[in-house]
């Protein structure tokens, strides 16, 4: 997304920001006028022998001043070279280009963590191989392009799952004891529980690929684990907690400079009840039941100091709530940075994300209040986004708290979803993207059309685009109960013996592959080996992100069927 010490510049004519360029002529010493030897003509500057002759003919005071100037200039040049990783090879001596480093990958860590050893699935899916089933109500298409004319490396990753974790039953206990697809550890007899709950994500890396690759392999697993432990917590809060956890784990790794923007979406089946307190007009049954049980328990405790009444109030409330509940399709989103998610509703583009850029007034105020500053629309003059995962060296300013939304899908009007990095949005508006692919029923073809359009419009960044085409007829059948319900604990299709989530099944396959290769993934030896590998990776770590792009477009947010949770945005 952004050019940095590990990425090539977007334009050869602007290979390095002006603030980082060093004029080689500043290292030449120009003797002051008044010297007896220079009253008739000036000697050419820049040569070694010229400087030596000038020093021999100049007074001692001038020699000392010039020596001090040369020392300071040399020190400045050395520091600039180290911070920007300037190349000093003869082939590149004519211009200051960033040194080409091998992209950081997680291959060396795969032997220590099954999640990091999962092979790429179809369409280069970082989460592994995930395919639709006859009961799937959506189809995913993904196209990515390095943009080789402008980029030497591909720093984007993406992930998706067709059968993400099932929606928990109301008042389910923590750790997923009552949750479909998560009650048992995967084993040889385990099978994937078909949930029709989708997970989609795009990670746009900068200053190397490490953070983006790590998130592509791990974020959905962290999210699933948090959802299992908090089955009655609203999903937007769980998304915020997941991003915070990911940020904390990345900060502990030695690769401090790598970071990524992120946009993720969850498409879930939920039993929901009407709610006047929700912007969507309804709320999920599980959190509502938990809140009602807690409220009734508190009132009973005040009337009678009997603690058992609080715990027994839940089952008595649940039947009343279930009578009002209806099955609905819900889309949850979360993003940090400038990757976007767009929902097409009746042909209109609805943006369900927020561009966290230095040009945004709200984000600029937040950065200033945190002790930073915005220079040339960049955080401290370095990073073009104000929120990201990773970037530990700027973590006091660049937070990982996401912007979250909650949208109830309207099957009669909601057609498809677009997730893409800024490589597309820099040259294409939200509505243009919708208009380009609205009449393209195939999701894969639609994603390719958008990437090709961005290349034709001279996008200078890596390109990743994901299109999720909704099967409106299938959604209507489930909502109208003309088809068997799916996705929520308690449904007949969820009652699978030794059933596990799709993510758990993929990890189990990777663990078996490691076992067949006689590679241990636990114990002190594995942990020590993991730390040794990580510390070795630090030696080749790219420098901080240096963005050459200057985007002045102000973000616009579509306020439709959305709720904000822990966004920190006024």
From Swiss-Prot:
Provide the GO MF annotations for this entry: metal ion binding; protein serine/threonine phosphatase activity
Catalysed reaction equations from the record:
O-phospho-L-seryl-[protein] + H2O = L-seryl-[protein] + phosphate; O-phospho-L-threonyl-[protein] + H2O = L-threonyl-[protein] + phosphate
UniProt-annotated binding residues for Mn(2+) 2: 204, 422, 461
Q: Which cofactor does it need?
A: Mg(2+); Mn(2+)
The record's comment on cofactor binding reads: Binds 2 magnesium or manganese ions per subunit. Has highest activity with magnesium, but also has activity with calcium.
Specify whether Manganese is a keyword of the entry.
yes
For the biological process aspect of GO, one term held by this record is: negative regulation of protein targeting to mitochondrion
Segments for region (Disordered): 1-72, 108-144, 295-318, 516-570
Q: Which Gene3D superfamilies match?
A: PPM-type phosphatase domain
Gene Ontology CC annotations of this record: cytoplasm; nucleus
Provide the primary localization: cytoplasm
Per the record, what phenotype accompanies loss of this gene's function?
Increases phosphorylation and mitochondrial localization of pgk1. Decreases formation of autophagic vesicles. Decreases conidia formation and aflatoxin production and reduces virulence on maize and peanut; double knockout with ptc2 exacerbates the effect and also leads to decreased colony growth. Increases sclerotia formation; double knockout with ptc2 abolishes sclerotia formation.
Basic and acidic residues bias spans: 525-539
Cytoplasm: present as a keyword of the record? yes
Q: Where is the PPM-type phosphatase domain?
A: 139-470
Quote the annotated effect of residue 204 to A: Decreases activity
> Bias category Polar residues: which stretches?
1-28, 119-136, 306-315, 553-570
Q: What family is this protein classified in?
A: Belongs to the PP2C family.
Under which name does UniProt file this protein?
Answer: Protein phosphatase 2C homolog 1
């Amino acid at each position: 997304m952004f050019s940095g010490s590990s990425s090539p510049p977007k334009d050869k004519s602007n290979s390095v920001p002006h603030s980082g360029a060093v004029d080689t002529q500043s290292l030449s010493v120009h003797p002051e006028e008044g010297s007896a030897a220079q009253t008739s003509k000036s000697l050419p500057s820049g040569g070694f022998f010229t400087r030596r002759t000038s020093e021999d003919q100049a007074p001692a005071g001038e020699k000392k001043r010039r020596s001090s100037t040369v020392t300071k200039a040399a020190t400045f040049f050395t520091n600039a070279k180290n911070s920007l990783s300037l190349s000093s090879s003869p082939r590149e001596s004519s211009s200051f280009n960033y040194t080409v480093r091998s992209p950081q990958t997680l291959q060396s860590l795969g032997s220590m963590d099954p999640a990091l050893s999962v092979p790429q699935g179809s369409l280069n899916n970082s989460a592994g191989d995930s395919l639709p089933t006859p009961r799937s109500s959506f189809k995913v298409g993904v196209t990515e392009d390095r943009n080789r004319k402008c980029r030497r490396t591909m720093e984007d990753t993406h992930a998706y799952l067709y059968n993400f974790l099932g929606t928990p039953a109301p008042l389910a206990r923590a750790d997923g004891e009552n949750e479909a697809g998560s009650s048992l550890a995967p084993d040889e007899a385990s099978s994937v529980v078909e949930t029709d709950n989708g997970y989609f994500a795009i990670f746009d890396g900068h200053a190397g690929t490490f953070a983006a690759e790590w998130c592509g392999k791990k974020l959905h697993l962290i999210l699933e684990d948090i959802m299992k432990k908090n089955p009655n917590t609203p999903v937007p809060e769980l998304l915020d907690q997941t991003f915070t956890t990911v940020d904390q784990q990345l900060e502990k790794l030695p690769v401090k400079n790598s970071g990524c923007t992120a946009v993720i979406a969850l498409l879930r089946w939920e039993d929901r009840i009407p709610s006047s307190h929700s912007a969507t007009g309804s709320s999920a049954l599980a959190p509502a039941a938990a809140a009602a049980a807690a409220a009734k328990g508190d009132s009973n405790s005040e009337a009678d100091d009997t603690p058992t009444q609080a715990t027994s109030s839940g089952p008595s409330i649940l039947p009343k709530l279930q009578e009002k509940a209806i099955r609905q399709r819900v889309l949850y989103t979360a993003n940090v940075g400038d990757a976007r998610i767009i929902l097409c509703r009746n042909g209109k583009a609805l943006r369900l994300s927020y561009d966290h850029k230095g040009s945004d007034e709200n984000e600029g105020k937040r950065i200033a209040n945190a002790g930073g500053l915005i220079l040339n629309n960049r955080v401290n003059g370095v990073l073009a986004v104000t929120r990201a995962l990773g970037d530990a060296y700027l973590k006091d300013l660049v937070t990982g708290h996401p912007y979250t939304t909650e949208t109830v899908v309207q099957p009669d009007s909601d057609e498809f979803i677009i997730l893409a990095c800024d490589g597309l949005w820099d040259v294409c508006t939200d509505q243009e993207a919708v208009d380009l692919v609205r009449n393209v029923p195939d999701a894969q073809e639609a994603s390719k059309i958008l990437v090709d359009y961005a290349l034709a419009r001279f996008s200078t960044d890596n390109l990743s685009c994901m299109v999720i085409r909704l099967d409106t007829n299938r959604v209507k059948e489930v909502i109208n109960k003309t088809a068997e319900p799916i996705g929520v604990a308690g449904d007949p299709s969820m009652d699978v013996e030794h059933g596990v989530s799709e993510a758990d099944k993929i990890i189990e396959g990777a663990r078996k592959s490691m076992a067949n290769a006689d590679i241990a993934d636990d114990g002190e030896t594995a942990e020590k080996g993991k730390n040794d590998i990580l510390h070795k990776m630090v030696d080749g770590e790219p420098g901080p992100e240096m963005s050459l792009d200057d985007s002045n477009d102000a973000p616009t947010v579509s306020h439709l069927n959305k709720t904000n949770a822990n966004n920190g945005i006024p």
